[in-house]
């Protein structure tokens, strides 16, 4: 089945607690529930509206153009803050695309989007692990947008610099000791 923009059902219209449109059941019910819960918490804490769309095919349509058109048609994000995000996966193209509103581009940059896709999502998708790829990708997106991933990354960098300082101190002490013995 090949979807057009007009064929894609917007689940949010019938249930505002649903964030995943998956008409062909590519994801398991458990994965959809997990993603819906994460994105519900994200919207409650930040106001950011997110839609995840899983489609088997869009034919020869370009995923970039399809995503932008769907994003505009659905009006994802609040009008004043333009804080929406669409995560579109097209199975037969084996591609995932993030479309962001201007209001979150400073946080969900193209580089961050690509990093999440290439490190967390695409490797799992290549193995047919649609659930794992989408759940881990959405988790990273939610952490990025609510600020917790930045805090984790900052802590990681601090830990690394502390380790390097300790290592330099130990090596320096050993060299002084060896020099004093010789």
Which residues fall in each region the model found?
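Juxtamembrane interface at the cytosolic side of transmembrane helices
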Residues: 175-182
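Folded, non-transmembrane soluble domains that reside on the lumenal/extracytoplasmic side of membranes
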Residues: 1-168, 182
């Amino acid at each position: 089945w090949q979807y057009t923009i007009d064929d894609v059902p917007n689940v949010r219209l019938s249930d505002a607690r649903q964030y995943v449109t998956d008409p062909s059941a590519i994801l398991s019910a458990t994965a959809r529930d997990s993603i819906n819960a994460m994105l519900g918490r994200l919207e409650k804490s930040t106001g950011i509206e997110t839609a995840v769309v899983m489609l088997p095919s869009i034919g020869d349509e370009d995923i970039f153009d399809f995503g932008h058109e769907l994003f505009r048609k659905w009006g994802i994000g609040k009008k004043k803050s333009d804080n929406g995000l669409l995560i579109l996966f097209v199975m037969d193209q084996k591609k995932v695309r993030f479309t962001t509103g201007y209001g979150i581009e400073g946080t969900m940059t193209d580089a961050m989007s690509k990093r999440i896709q290439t490190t967390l999502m695409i490797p799992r998708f290549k193995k047919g692990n649609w659930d794992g790829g989408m759940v881990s990708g959405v988790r990273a997106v939610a952490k990025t947008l609510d600020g917790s991933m930045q805090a984790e990354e900052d802590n990681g960098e601090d830990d690394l610099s502390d380790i390097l300082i300790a290592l330099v101190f130990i090596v320096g002490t050993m060299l002084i000791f060896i020099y004093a013995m010789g």
